[in-house]
Amino acid sequence: MDKKTARLRRAAKTRHKIHELGVVRLTVHRTPKHIYVQIIKPADGNVVASASTVESMLKQQLKNTGNKEAAITVGKTIAERAKAKGIAKVAFDRSGYKYHGRVKALADAAREGGLQF
């Protein structure tokens, strides 16, 4: 089993558990250059709010889009957008990535912004 297959297996397991709970989930996708985050409703799978380093507003604020500082900015942004939509509690879906580095920085920033995991 290669690295990507193992990550996808972990992600599927986590998503199944979150789906059984029926709560709103905060899902993260990470690439070497960018980080993306979405808040997804459990019932219909619709995206309620999203943020990423690809957005021009965030890109202008950042010197580099693939580091912890960028993840912190995205975490704060998603927390603001979730509050605006009336969402305070989410389940954190790290998509099989280790809770370390940029993923951890994003989660901590979202918590500081007012989201509860």
Curated annotation (Swiss-Prot):
Pfam families: Ribosomal_L18p. The keyword Isomerase does not apply. Coiled coil: none annotated. InterPro entries: Ribosomal_uL18_bac-type, Ribosomal_uL18_bac/euk. CDD domains: Ribosomal_L18_L5e. One of its GO terms (molecular function) is structural constituent of ribosome. Keywords: Ribonucleoprotein, Ribosomal protein, RNA-binding, rRNA-binding. GO terms for cellular component: cytosolic large ribosomal subunit. The keyword tRNA-binding does not apply. GO terms for biological process: translation. It comes from the Bacteria. This is one of the proteins that bind and probably mediate the attachment of the 5S RNA into the large ribosomal subunit, where it forms part of the central protuberance. HAMAP family: Ribosomal_uL18_B. Part of the 50S ribosomal subunit; part of the 5S rRNA/L5/L18/L25 subcomplex. Contacts the 5S and 23S rRNAs. PANTHER family: 39S RIBOSOMAL PROTEIN L18, MITOCHONDRIAL, LARGE RIBOSOMAL SUBUNIT PROTEIN UL18M. Belongs to the universal ribosomal protein uL18 family. This is Large ribosomal subunit protein uL18.
